[in-house]
Amino acid sequence: LEKTHDFIRRSGSFNKSIKALKELRKNNISTSVITSINKENICELEELYQLLSDLGVNSWQLQIALPMGNFAKRPEWLIEPQDILSIIDFAYNKIGGKLLIVLADCIGYYSNKDIKVNENFLNDNWSWTGCGAGKHVIGILHNGDIVACTSIRDKTLVAGNIREKSLKSIWESPDSFKWNRNFDSSKLKGFCRECRYTERCLGGCSNSRYCING
């Protein structure tokens, strides 16, 4: 675990993360961990689950490492579509365990298993109804830029800056987040265009679609 983590992040970051989690638990502060899954760490999920459980972590989000940032330089690390099924199975088999698992927006959508995983996390009915970026949620970056989703870093999709305009005016502008607010199933291609969930799903996670298909 340490070798894989430090190779992806930087040397020493694994032990620093463990130390931080222990300190937070000692002070009764809830913790959540996010793992971006790639071909190098997908085989370590079980070991990581046990470690996080022992550390008293409250929840664990599993997501796919997408070809953006430094990861774009390592396309060979991107998992295959069939690997997603094994991730869903892993999370499903952990329902009822000490550690709550949630599947990120880039995994799943309409299999019975991934629905059960997210319902278990939310303790409520759950159903994917398309990407909510710019429709139900927005993000504020470190420099004040307003984006529909903090994972999408294309500067052409920045809707404004909180230092220059009010959040209300940015949100209510008809020009903001048009790429997703006006998105419909006619813009989908390939299997997504033919899927029976097309109208409801709208192609899944926008960032996944953007990173992989452009």
Language model segments and positions:
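Radical SAM/AdoMet-radical enzyme domain recognition
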Residues: 1-80
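Iron-sulfur cluster-binding electron-transfer modules in prokaryotic oxidoreductases
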Residues: 51-69, 91, 104-108, 113-114, ...
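C-terminal accessory region of radical SAM enzymes
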Residues: 82-119, 145-196, 202
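Short, basic/aromatic recognition patches
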Residues: 117-131
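Short, small/polar residue-rich loop motifs at catalytic or cofactor-binding pockets
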Residues: 131-135, 156
